[in-house]
């Protein structure tokens, strides 16, 4: 249990619930997380938890909304301070790496939702996140082509998919190794290879 006070304002209680779910997802299969486990982690009864979230699906919606809002806000801030499209791509990459390193339950939650056969609202939120994230990447990749940083014949969609795919690969490698810190160690080298692959060689 986290030892949080039992009497929190509704917004703080919802935020604490999201935090508890993300923490639990780092320790176990997200699909196996029960409302009992969430309530126990927070030091609450199930009844108290359900006063804020009527269903487990509502909890997952809140978690996915937080992931989307938090990740996109962070990458937007990172890109805004960059001096060029390629610098912005690198800033986004490292910010994303920092985010999943700090919250290892997040990629587990995302992978878990995308594997759901039903088109649930949490799954739709993940799909919207992937779409919005990809759109940001394609805009930067297009700007890089226009400014001559990137290859003129670069396939924007493929480059965006590969960008996300390398992060997913780093996450999978860290899960296999049981070593979250490995993501941060390997990321600079992986991005360097990616950057060389899309750069203008002229």
Predicted regions and their residues:
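C-terminal peripheral helix-coil segments that are non-catalytic and often amphipathic
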Residues: 1-2, 98-99, 135-147, 162, ...
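Generic hydrophobic, amphipathic alpha-helix propensity
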Residues: 13-22, 38, 63-67, 71, ...
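Helix-turn-helix
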Residues: 16, 24-58, 62
